[in-house]
Design a protein with these regions (language model features):
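Histidine- and acidic-residue-rich, metal-dependent catalytic cores
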Residues: 1-179
Length: 179
């Protein structure tokens, strides 16, 4: 496929990622390369990103998609088997258990969208309020941010997020709130 005089270090790394990114951390998956094979770090990173993207995106061949929070929990549960546990922990710290753009219901009933994550406290992101507990809609032009890590706002013993939700169920387009 490639002539040896055209192979650079970069093209070899790219080809290796193409070969390895469906291999699991425990060397199951495909292609089967044997028990002594060492999956490259770039392939392990792409494997995590590819899985997250596939599970959270609507595909032509797959009508269902999962909300990001459920995907993160699923992938964490496969850490050490499907995914490199160190890289998986880093991915969760970067993305958050409730990734930016996630729709959540707070324990007091408000609907909010995650706008920033805190790698030191994965269950207390910064959110933008969208609807109050009394179902009052907060328009995109009004910016109401709440740092769920603010212990004065949320008592430490209380988890601020009751559940992650699918915006389509509520007929919400979150894009205007991201701008």
């Amino acid at each position: 496929l490639l002539r040896s005089d055209q192979l650079t270090e970069l093209t070899m790394k790219v080809a290796l990622v193409g070969l390895e990114h469906h291999m699991r951390f425990d060397l199951t998956g495909y292609p089967r390369m044997g028990d002594q094979w060492e999956i490259g770090v770039m392939s392990r990173i792409v494997s995590i990103a590819d899985c997250y993207d596939a599970m959270t995106s609507r595909r032509t061949y797959e009508t269902d998609r999962l909300i990001p929070h459920r995907v993160m929990l699923h992938m964490l549960g496969r850490s050490g088997k499907n995914f490199d546990p160190v890289l998986m922990r880093l991915f969760v710290c970067l993305m958050g258990l409730y990734p930016v753009g996630s729709l959540v219901r707070l324990t007091r009933g408000d609907l909010a969208m995650v706008v920033a994550t805190d790698p030191t406290d994965l269950v207390r992101p910064v959110v933008r309020l969208l609807r109050t507990a009394q179902e009052q809609i907060i328009p995109p032009s009004e910016l109401q941010l709440v740092n769920l890590n603010d212990r004065g706002f949320w008592p430490e013993a209380e988890l601020p997020i009751r559940e992650a939700l699918d915006p389509e169920v509520f007929g919400l387009d979150l894009a205007p709130y991201l701008l």
